[in-house]
Amino acid sequence: MTTLATLIFLVTLLFVLWQPKGLDIGITALTGAFIAVITGVVSFSDVFEVTGIVWNATLTFVSVILISLILDKVGLFEWSAIHMLHASKGNGLKMFVYIILLGAIVAAFFANDGAALILTPIVLAMVKNIGFSKRAIFPFIIASGFIADTTSLPLIVSNLVNIISADYFHIGFIRYFSRMIIPNLFSLLASIIVLWLYFRKAIPKTFDDNNIKHPKDAINDLKLFKISWIVLVILLFGYLISEFTKIPVSIFTGIIAFIFLMLARKSNALNIKQVIKGAPWNIVLFSIGMYIVVFGLRNAGITLILAKILEYISNYGLFSTILGMGFISAFLSSIMNNMPTVLIDAIAIGQSNVHGMLKEGLIYANVIGSDLGPKITPIGSLATLLWLHVLTQKDVKISWGTYFKTGIIITIPVLFITLIGLYLTLIIF
C-alpha cells in the first residue's frame, strides 16, 4: 500500500506540474483521487474528511481573487502603483522600495496569487514606459513576484496555504494575525534588503518622471472605484466577525464578492462574465483531489515518518524546532509544490507527540516555509508557473536556471530571518 500510495501521489504531482497539452490541474488531481479511492488507498470517509478541510479555504481564496479581479479592472491597483511612482520623485531606489511595499499590501489583503499575477503586468508596463532597459526591468519583475509570496503571511486570507493550515488546526483570524504579523514584517524588511543587495547594480539611480500619467487617469469607473474602498472596509470587518461568530470566512467573502459583482455588472469598465471566468475555479477541484491523494500517504504511514522527525528536532528546543520545520517545509515545497506540502506537514504535526509552544512553533513555521519555499524553484507553486507564462507572453523570458539561481540566493536568508521573527514572537508574546 505504501508503494501504491507514493506512486499515485508522484504521478499525480508530475501531471499537475507538467500539464501536458494544457491538461487542467483540477482534472488531473481528481483523476489521481479517483484512482486512490478505487484502489483502496483512501476510503470514502477520507473523501468527506478532505472536503470538510478544504472547502472553506478554497472558496475563500476564489472569492478574494474575484474581488481583486474587479478592483484590477476598475483601476485601483494601477492607481496605487502610479501614486508610488510619483512618490519616488525620479529616484530609482525609492521606486523599487515603494513597489515592494505596494506588493506587500496587495499580497496581504488579496492573496499572493492576486498580487503576483495582477501587479506584475502593471509594474512591467510602467517600467517599460519609463524607458528602462531589460537589465533594469528584471529587478522590478522579480521583486513583484517575490514579494507576493514572502509577505503573504499576515492574514489567513493572504495565501491559500495559510487558510488550509488555519482551518486544519482551528486557528482564528485574530490569533493567526497576532502570531504572524511580526514574522511578516521581518520578511518584508529582509526582502527589501536582500533584493536591493542582489540587484543594486541593475536598479537605475534616477528616472524621468515627467511623462508618468496622473493616477486619476488609471481609474476606469469612478463610481465603482469609490465603492471599492467601502468593499475593502466591509471585507476586513467580515474577517474579524468570522473570528467571533465562528461562521466560515468563505461565507463572508463569498457574499461580499457576489454583491460586488452585482454592483459592477452595469459598469463599462469590465465584463462580469470574463471576471467570473477568470477566477481560479479549478483550484477547488485541485485542492480536493490533491488532498485526497495526500491522505493516501497518511493512510500508508508515510506522514508518521515525518512526525517522528519533527519529534526529534523538537527535543532541541523551540529555536531548532522552528528552523527545522521551516526549512523542511520550504525544501519540500520547492521540489513538490507547496499545496501538498502544507497538508502533509500539517498531518505530520498532528500525528507527532509535540505539544504546547513547540507545536505552535511547528504549525506557523510550516506556513512560513510553505509560503516562502516555493520561490526557490519555478515548480514551487502553481502561481509561479502561471506568472512565468504571463511574462513570456509579454516578451519577458526568465529561464528556469536563472529563476533557480536568483530564487535560492534571495529566499534562504529571507526565510531564516522570517523564522527568527516567529521565534521572537512566540517567546516574547
From Swiss-Prot:
Pfam families per the UniProt record, alphabetical: ArsB (PF02040)
InterPro entries: Arsenical_pump_ArsB (IPR000802)
Topology in membrane: Multi-pass membrane protein
Keyword Membrane: yes
GO biological process, one term: response to arsenic-containing substance
Localization of this protein: Cell membrane
Keywords, in A-Z order: Arsenical resistance, Cell membrane, Membrane, Transmembrane, Transmembrane helix, Transport
Chain segments annotated as transmembrane: 3-23, 25-45, 50-70, 99-119, 137-157, 180-200, 222-242, 244-264, 275-295, 316-336, 372-392, 408-428
GO MF: arsenite transmembrane transporter activity
GO CC entries: plasma membrane
Entry-linked PANTHER family: TRANSPORTER ARSB-RELATED
Similarity-based family: Belongs to the ArsB family.
Function comment: Involved in arsenical resistance. Thought to form the channel of an arsenite pump.
Name of the protein in its database record: Arsenical pump membrane protein
Organism field: Staphylococcus aureus (strain MW2)
